[in-house]
Amino acid sequence: MAEAARDVWITGIGIVSSLGEGPEAHWQKLMAAQPSADTTTLAPFVVHPLAPVNFDAQIPKKGDQRQMEPWQRIGTYAAGLALDSAGVKGKPDILSHMDMI
């Protein structure tokens, strides 16, 4: 089965990690060579703990947050940041034609 050609547009970036939240925080820490590593809590293993995140900013319903595993909350939070970055959050006419990866 032949697949139709599709245009792909990257319109927003959502990133949260041990370096912080958003592209700017990441670039600043990467350029300054400021790793965020915890070498004591789970020694001898090095851990890069997630930066403090207010999940309420992207997942307003506490019930939704309670039903999610940590990885789901982080992914949903990052997706919300990407929608904010793209400027399409709260615009159903655009969101109804959009796929997220």
Where would I find each of the regions flagged by the language model?
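Conserved "HGTGT" condensation-loop signature of ketosynthase/thiolase-family condensing enzymes
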Residues: 1-101
